[in-house]
A protein has these predicted regions:
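Conserved beta-strand segments of the P-loop GTPase G domain that flank and frequently precede/overlap
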Residues: 6-7, 38, 121-124, 155-161, ...
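Conserved nucleotide-binding/hydrolysis micro-motifs of P-loop NTPases
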Residues: 41-44, 126-128, 160-164, 194-199, ...
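Canonical P-loop GTPase G-domain recognition
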Residues: 184, 196-321
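Helical mechanochemical/support elements of P-loop NTPase systems and associated helical scaffolds
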Residues: 51, 75, 79-86, 90-93, ...
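Alpha-helical scaffold elements adjacent to nucleotide-binding pockets in ATP/GTP-utilizing enzyme cores
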Residues: 17-21, 136-140, 173-180, 308-312
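Nucleotide-state-sensitive switch-loop elements of NTP-binding domains
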Residues: 1-7, 12-139, 145-151
Length: 321
């Protein structure tokens, strides 16, 4: 059996990706039995995909908050502790779901199809309490690997529109990716999800953010200058048009662009960037030193992007059959 742990911050598109991956494999690789496992007890009541194994049958974050009178973080820790005691239930349900999916593939193929190894997609919770405050996720990973002989890969999603918003947010995304990589100790793939939400200009500029390991040498200072230029321009417009109701005169745009170009040349990053620039630069030097971070763009509606990501995952886990 092979599988992927779909993780990332809340709102990064994990659940949407899981459903998109299931639909993609059902069309382009119908001989691969796919089992979906939801491990997030805080997922919404109306689930966007048919879930083979759902941890909410064991514990629900909302019910824990109501019955135990705990806050959100305390409820997550309570859920994690209960999930750890029900590892056997999860393994049993996964085994039953695998048997069902294998039968479905054989029946659909008329009995003449040789199924590929089962494939497990795990929708992981995004809250940090499940990783730093509890051993439940690591216990489950080891149980899947040992008891089901499941070869796993971490697919770490971050929102492209958020991560490429500014340099400091991008640095945070890189640190989060490295932390997850070290914590899971599994083959690892980083993904910029929601790539389709970027504008054409942002999408072209976003190509630079995909290459984290070469970001320092090629794009760091250039993008910092661009960020500072945009900040200065916004401040200037705020002074000229304080109410926001006035429109920038089109005749002013060429002179504004020329002034922006002059400002780029005049920007002293050490002085104008301040402590944030120096701190971000120091952190990115650490990221660059690892030489392990890069991102794949993903639009779940794009066949090419889904195919490329699926091939990368299969290469990581050795799923070549």
């Amino acid at each position: 059996m092979f599988g992927e742990l779909v993780c990332g911050p809340p709102g990064s598109g994990k659940t949407t990706y899981c459903e998109g991956k299931r639909q993609f494999l059902s069309v382009y690789e119908p001989t691969r039995p796919v089992v979906l496992l939801n491990l997030d007890p805080a997922n919404e009541d109306i689930f966007p995909y048919p879930c083979d194994v759902d941890i909410r049958e064991v514990v629900s974050h909302v019910r824990v908050m109501e019955t135990e009178e705990l806050g959100p973080n305390g409820s997550y820790l309570f859920c994690a502790a209960l999930m750890e005691r029900r590892i056997d239930w999860i393994i049993q349900k996964v085994e039953e779901a695998v048997d069902r999916r294998l039968r479905d593939v054989v029946i659909t193929g008329g009995g003449s199809v040789h199924p590929r190894p089962p494939y497990l997609i795990i929708d992981c919770p995004g809250q940090v309490e499940f990783y730093l405050g509890s051993p439940v996720m690591h216990t489950l990973f080891r149980a899947l690997q040992k008891r089901l002989c499941c070869t796993l890969c971490t697919v770490h999603l971050v929102d492209a529109s958020v991560s490429t918003r500014d340099i400091s947010t991008y640095v945070s995304s890189c640190l989060l990716s490295i932390t997850t990589m070290i914590d899971h100790e599994l083959p690892h793939i980083n993904v910029f999800s929601k790539w389709d939400t970027l504008s054409v200009e942002d999408s072209e500029e976003g190509e630079a953010y995909l290459r984290a390991s070469s970001f320092m040498a090629e794009d760091f200072d250039r993008l910092w200058k661009k960020q500072l230029r945009q900040r200065r321009r916004n401040q200037r417009l705020a002074k000229l048009y304080p109410t926001g109701a006035e429109k920038l005169d089109a005749r002013d745009e060429p002179s504004a662009a020329a002034r922006d170009d002059m400002e780029v040349e005049a920007i002293d990053l050490e002085k104008d960037g301040g402590h944030l620039y120096r701190y971000s630069k120091a952190v990115m030097e650490v990221v660059d030193g690892y030489g392990l971070i890069g991102f794949l763009p993903l639009d779940v509606q794009s066949q090419d992007m889904m195919t490329r990501l699926t091939q990368q995952i299969d290469d990581c886990i050795g799923n070549f059959l």
